[in-house]
Amino acid sequence: MDSYKRIGNIGEAAILNKFVEMGVPVYIPFGDNEKSDLVADFNGKLNRIQVKTSNHFDDKKNNFKVSLTSSTIRNKNHYRHKYSKEDIDYFGVYNIPTKMCLLLPIEKFSMKTIATIPFPYEDKTHNQYEAINYADYLFENIINK
């Protein structure tokens, strides 16, 4: 079983690699205490990216889920932090089994704690989660060249 830290490192490396493949300049904030993991220069501005990694894919439901929060433990108390547009501009999401890289804009996902991504896309608006068409959030569809 991989540690959470290792899984996160795999996701950060995959998202970084995707930006580099697309010719997007990427900067890495120093230290481990920043809200963003990467800063990428695209669409005319520097964008703060918080990377989230999912290492599961539900074959029966054809989807994967990814947490859009961070959690810390201080003095035996568990704290969960929701990100806002003051913290980041995008979630860079990587799913290990499918090798899918997505960019989720914070404006559309700041109120969510978990994103459920159906793959391939199915409209599930009548179900218990909002339909998210993964194709809308592929790097190629977010980054203007």
Where do the model's predicted regions map?
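Mixed-charge (Asp/Glu-Lys/Arg
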Residues: 1-34, 40-145
